[in-house]
Structure formats: C-alpha cells, structure tokens
C-alpha cells in the first residue's frame, strides 16, 4: 500500500528516468538549428572533433548531447528520417547499459544508430547483435550510408566468413552480426595457434536487438564447438528396434504393486523414465541381441553407455515429434526452434539424441561429437564492459534481466498513442470447435477485405490450418520454418487488403508488417523505375494504406497461447504499429497443450457442467486467471532452469577463464622459458616427494623407484644410490638440491645442443598442444559429471555443492597432469633442428583442424558416450607396459 502511495507521489522509477532523459532531449533539440546550418563537410568533421575530445579526457556521457544531435542531422540528410524524441530517449537508455522496451514499429534499428555512433568514438568497437544472418546483413547495409557519411566504418559478421573477412569486420568501428557468430568467434579465438589468427578485439559495448529472444529464450542452451568422435551408428540402429516393443505406463506405480508399463513420460520436464519392468524387459532383449551377457544389468558401470543409448532412443520416439521439433529434409534431421519456428540448419542435439532421431526416421546416422569448447550466452555477454538491449517485450522478464545480467528495463513511450484493440480470449471445449471459430473470424475479415495474420505455435498447426483454409477456398500464404526463404516477400504482402497470412512464432520477427503493403518492396520489384514510376507507386500505396486503416488495420488471430506471455505479446505487437488501427484475438481450447498440462482440471469439468453447446465459447475471469497462472508456472520453471544452468556453468566459467587467460599469455609471450622453468620445478619436487617424503626417515625412501621414474619418464639418468654410498653426509634437503641441480643441468645441456631460440619455440608449441588436449579431455569429464550429478540428491547430498567440489578436484588434477606431461615431453624429445619444431606445430594444427560443428543446442539431453570402453587415466595402459595410461599412450607426443 505504502509502495503504491509513494509511486503516486513521486512517480515510478521508470517515470523518473524518462523525465530526467527528457531534459537531455530538450538540449539535443536546441542544437538542431545550429547543426542544420553546417555543410556536409563541417558535419562530418564533428566525428574527428569528438574523438580528439575523448582522448583529451571527456567522457562518452559528456559528448552525448552533441553526438546524438549530429547523428539526427546526418540521418535527415542521408535517409530523410529524423529521430523522434522517444528514439533519443531509447538511445540514452542503451548508452547507459540498460534494456529499452520499444513497441514494434517504433524504429529500433534507427534508435540503435545513436549509442552505436557515440560509443564508436572510443575506437574500442561496438557490436550490434541480431538473431539471424538476414537481419544482421539487412541492418548493416541499411545503416552503412549513415555511418560512412559520419566517417565511421561498418562491418558485418555472419556464418561462413573467412578469418581475414572476420578480422576486417571486427576492425570496423561498428560490427553487426548474430549472437551465435559472436559467441563462436570468442571460442574460436581461444583455439588459435598464433595471435595473428584472432578475430575479436576485447569486448567493449554490445547492443542486442530482440534481447529477450537472445538472453532469455536461447539462454538455456550453450554454444558448443565440437569435433567428430567415433562411429557407433550400428548400435543406434539396434536400440532403435527395441523401443517400439516397449509399453507406456499411464498411471504412477502404487506402493507394493508391480509396474504396469515399461516407461513413464513427464511432459512438463520433457523426460522419459524407465520402470523396473522396462529395465528387465530391455535387458532380456539385449541378452538375446548379445549386447548384454546373461545376468548383467543395464545399470552397471560397464553398461552405462548402453543405458544412455536406450534413454536417447526413448526420448527420440516418445518426446520428439516430426514437423513439431524437427523436419526431415534431404535425408537429414533439421531441428525446428521451439521459440521462433525457424529451422536451424547445421545444428544438432547433443549427447546422442540427434543420432537416435536419425535412427528413428531411417536417415543417415552421422557420427557423435566431442566437445572442444563451450560457453553459455549468459557468461559470454557478461564479458562485455557494457551491455544493452532492445525489444518490444521485456517487461514480463524484467526481474530475470536484472537478476542474471544486472540489466535494468526501461519502458519507452510510443511516439503515437496505441489504438490497437486487444479482444478478450475465447475458450472452447475442443480443438475442432476452436478451429471452426477461427475459420468464421477469418471469413469475416476476408468478406470485408481486412488483412489477417494467423499465429500458430508449431509447423504442424500452420499446415493443418492451411489445409483447413484451402477446403474453405480462402487464398492465403504460409510463413513457417519450411518456407522462410520467401519470408521477406510474404511479410511485405501481409498488410495488404484481403491478405491472409499464417505464421509460426517467428512471424517475420524483425520485419514490420506495413498496412497497405511494403512500399520499398513494391519499388524494388520495378524494372529501372523512373521518378514518375516511383511517384505513382507512392500515391497508390497511400490509397492502399488508408483503405486498410478504414477496414480496421491488421487483425491478429492466435490459435493458442504460448507457454510464455512474452511470446503472446510479441504476436500482438505485429499489429497496431506507430499508432495504426489493429485488433487481436486469442482462440483457445481445453485440448491445447498449455491448458492440458498446466490448467486446472476443475475448469474443464466446470465447462462441461455448464452444459455448453457445440461451438459455444466461454469468456470468464476465472479461466483467464487460470491461463495466466499456467503461463507464470512455466515461466517460473524456465527461469529456474536457466538459473540452474548458469550456476553450473559459473563453475566451468571460472575454469574457462583461467585456461583462456593462460593460453592467451602463452600466445602473446614470445619467450616462455620462465614459465616452463617454474613448471619443471613443481614437477621435479613432486616426483621427489613421491619417493622421498619430506621430513621422513631414510628407511622410507624409495631411491630405486625415483631413479626409474626419472629415467623412464624424464630421460634423466641419475645414480642417486651411488651418491648416497659415496657421501654419508647427504640428507633429505641436500639430496633434493643435488637432484634438482642435476635435473636442471640435463635440460641446460639440451638447450645448448639445439639452441635457445629453437627450444623456446618448441616449449611454446608443446605447451599449447598439451593445454588444448587436456582442456578438451576436461570438458568431456565435466560433461559426464554434470549429467550424473543429480543422482547425488538420493544420497542426501547437495548436487550443486558436489559438482563444485568434484569439478575443482578434476580441474586441479588436470592442471597437475598438464605439468607432468609438458615436462615429460620436453625432457624426452630429441630436437635436431627448427624443422622438428615446425613439424610439432603442424601436427597440432592438423589435429585441431578436424571438421567442427558449431552448435547452439539442448543442454539437457541424456548423456552419451562412445561405445568403446574408456581407459581411465590412472588405470594400467592397455599396451602392457605396466605404466599408468596417462603416463604412456594416454599422453600426446
């Protein structure tokens, strides 16, 4: 109550920020007549003046008023477009490292030019990040004339570019690109072999367009660079034949009763679980197929791989649907993004799930992947010194933006008042009744000529609805993941009179639906148009635009509610841009997945008891409240999942930071002799400690073992036993010093034999090779630890604490193993000439240049391992040498 009273008295924080920024806008507007009087050359010279003032100590904030005024004046001259006052406020919000919520059609692309220009004056680079290559290229091409007029360069960073092209893009003052590509470039830069191969500069300032899509929707799934592991396609095919023989259990087990089915499905968590009966059933079949020996169990450590295969196949068959979660195209499984409805060419689900779906659909099974590098968007974007974003719908997720990223959301008022009519939801008992009502609404719009956009959640629904409209002889266009090549053309026509467009969630997001059709697209279709042709096209567009406004603008028909209110609001936002007329209506049924899984059964029973007739809809506050509660439940669960992923990835992120920092130091330092010397000291002391424990009795010393290890692993032959015979005064400390001195002398002899420069270069090559090899191995170990850590809860242990503890132990062990391997290789290897060093570097380069997959995929699929039993690093080497695997064939030569 007191909070509301204070808000009434002093205004909300949002109101206060807007009021404060409006004062700055007044100052910017006051400069307009002054800048209008300048020539083009004088206006361009302002950029050089601002840069000089920045180097002399003025801050970006002190330059803001003048810089924004210059961009507005340049935009008037280049585009004939003047930034609105609300766009100026949006630019200030972005410059302060906040999120600007701006409604669809309010000119986010033009708004972004203001903070982009201002922050580019620092020469540290500005990244403008969008959701796909088309939008990145479009926005870069559109803004380039403005920035080049002001003396700045613009680059575009999209998939498939060469290293040289990427470096050129990043050297530009302002770089447009996709979130995936910026993230992958960061990972790739930490896998290069020389500083000259890096693309990115230190990450300074980023503006994220559709920030909710990138930082919320895609944040549950990490970016992964992986290489191919070994082939186990035959096993996938065999397991695939087992799944159809299993029966689903509809009800939960009751205490004391046996399972009635082989597996259960949890639709909320999107998981499948084997019952005890299912486990026995599968084990019997596997014994028949000779995958298991009689009496063996699926849950033993040796068979954990088989269990992962079974669970992946179960999920593929029971949870992942064709034309909803993926499509089959050109003998390949192509994932469909659940948030946008777009196909994600080249992306693959991780840890065996994709191969299981390939086996299910009978297409070619591609090899599994091994993780080479990975990062989540949360941790990538938190590297930037300053981060900001724009979207039409951020307010519902404002808490998460603040909690995870420390980003405040500011709601920017619209330039024109919003007049769109958001009609109340209509709820039907069955899907059939719902679609009949949708058809009636579309027919009414068609009769009057009002354009209508029908929003669906899945490709399957859009195709079903398309068939439905064909039977009713209604002309329409379909915009979904299967046809997004024609996306721009379909969106350009969606606002025309009589247009009926069916679209999945993507709904041409990032492209405005203009009432009366897109004028620029119409002019682009003309062949060598004259001034007269363009004038005629503009006049005709004006007539068409006014006509559609008279009809009520764009009408949005939504076929069901999405699990996130934000996605629903995005669909609504397609209509009513810049003060245009428009209307929206959601049609729901009690059979919709959201209602079926989350809405109360009481509502369904209530609707039946009301004795509703077929085709009759219900509009009731109870039902609306129940739907909103259902959406909040899902949003809350998804937030928890993202938060949990971040908590786990924060552990890996600290380790990643250490490794990448060490790697970059290795790359940047010409001479790493002192680093190797410190490592040698650690290793030789560690080896001595194993055989001559500190402050121990002579009887506890293992001199023979020490001599053998030094000779076998470090090619250093020392007669320590003879030293002790010859000198009775040698004690623990003096003996240690003598061993270290002789060990160092042997290395100095090698240095003199091959030359200091050659050895330093070789040290660097070996360090990089060993670091990369151990880090990849560590990532794999972390993946496996992460997949199984949830089971610790059964032992009354906190999985997160256990993960932190064990991952730290793994990391410490990895760093120790790295040191021992590096010293072992450097001690044993015989270097004859500089060509030997080049050969090692080339071998490392080739080992890294395997075909790589760049994935942004599910982090929650079941774990998958290669079929061949993995030899533990501390187990005896299979070659029979008697040494540990890590000290024999487990080591990279």
Curated annotation (Swiss-Prot):
Segments of this protein annotated with the region Disordered: 840-893
GO annotation, biological process: intracellular protein transmembrane transport; protein import; protein targeting; protein transport by the Sec complex
Annotated EC: 7.4.2.8
GO molecular function, one term: protein-exporting ATPase activity
Binding of ATP, residues: 87, 105-109, 512
Coiled-coil region list: none
Signal peptide positions (record): none
Matching PANTHER family: CHLOROPLAST PROTEIN-TRANSPORTING ATPASE, SECA INNER MEMBRANE COMPONENT OF SEC PROTEIN SECRETION SYSTEM
Assembly, per entry: Monomer and homodimer. Part of the essential Sec protein translocation apparatus which comprises SecA, SecYEG and auxiliary proteins SecDF-YajC and YidC.
Protein name as it appears in the record: Protein translocase subunit SecA
Source organism of the structure: Colwellia psychrerythraea (strain 34H / ATCC BAA-681)
Lineage: Bacteria, Pseudomonadati, Pseudomonadota, Gammaproteobacteria, Alteromonadales
